Amino acid sequence: MFGLKQFYQNEVRAKLAQELDIKNPMLLPKLEKIVISVGAGAHAKDMKIMQNIAQTISLVAGQKAVITKAKKSVAGFKIREGMAVGAKVTLRNKRMYNFLEKLIVISLPRVKDFRGISRNGFDGRGNYTFGINEQLIFPEVVYDDIMVSHGMNITMVTSTDNDKEAFKLLELLGLPFAKVR
């Protein structure tokens, strides 16, 4: 699984330069990092479930997950400062491209009634975020090892500042966006 990075360097960069009319190759948009995160929600109080969530994300990403803690107390959500509220992993370079390739080729096709990911996940600054409802679409996750079914948010951070260039980059990399009706 090393093909996506070389595909980007050999083919995608040339197409981006042509379609976006960018002369300087250093200004071409590129994928900088992918952040996978999970909010524990109601399960935040149970440390065993938090450990299980972190372990699941670690399996999916191929890198150790960090348990995120609350920055301040919120009485309405029954959260205290310093309490574990989720887990996240930041992927860069080789692991990032391996994860993206696995996501595109293996995991997303396993989603029931999959018609493409939404085009509405761009934030206006060239970053794209989408959610996955269930972690079982990843081949590393074994059903018997799961304590609680949870989804995850996947954020792709690009080097560009506008959504049009980021969309073109992700589309050329092979992300299956939903068709416009």
From Swiss-Prot:
Claim: tRNA-binding is one of the keywords in the record: yes
Listed HAMAP family: Ribosomal_uL5_B
Biological processes annotated in GO: translation
rRNA-binding found in the keyword field: yes
Gene Ontology molecular function: rRNA binding; structural constituent of ribosome; tRNA binding
Cysteine-cysteine disulfides: none
Pfam family of the protein (one): Ribosomal_L5_C
Keyword annotations of the record: Ribonucleoprotein, Ribosomal protein, RNA-binding, rRNA-binding, tRNA-binding
Protein family per UniProt: Belongs to the universal ribosomal protein uL5 family.
InterPro entries, per database record: Ribosomal_uL5, Ribosomal_uL5_bac-type, Ribosomal_uL5_C, Ribosomal_uL5_CS, Ribosomal_uL5_dom_sf, Ribosomal_uL5_N
Complexes and interactors: Part of the 50S ribosomal subunit; part of the 5S rRNA/L5/L18/L25 subcomplex. Contacts the 5S rRNA and the P site tRNA. Forms a bridge to the 30S subunit in the 70S ribosome.
Gene3D superfamilies: 3.30.1440.10
Top-rank taxon, per record: Bacteria
Listed transmembrane segments: none
Protein name, entry field: Large ribosomal subunit protein uL5
Job description of the protein: This is one of the proteins that bind and probably mediate the attachment of the 5S RNA into the large ribosomal subunit, where it forms part of the central protuberance. In the 70S ribosome it contacts protein S13 of the 30S subunit (bridge B1b), connecting the 2 subunits; this bridge is implicated in subunit movement. Contacts the P site tRNA; the 5S rRNA and some of its associated proteins might help stabilize positioning of ribosome-bound tRNAs.
Coiled coil region boundaries: none
GO cellular component, one term: ribonucleoprotein complex
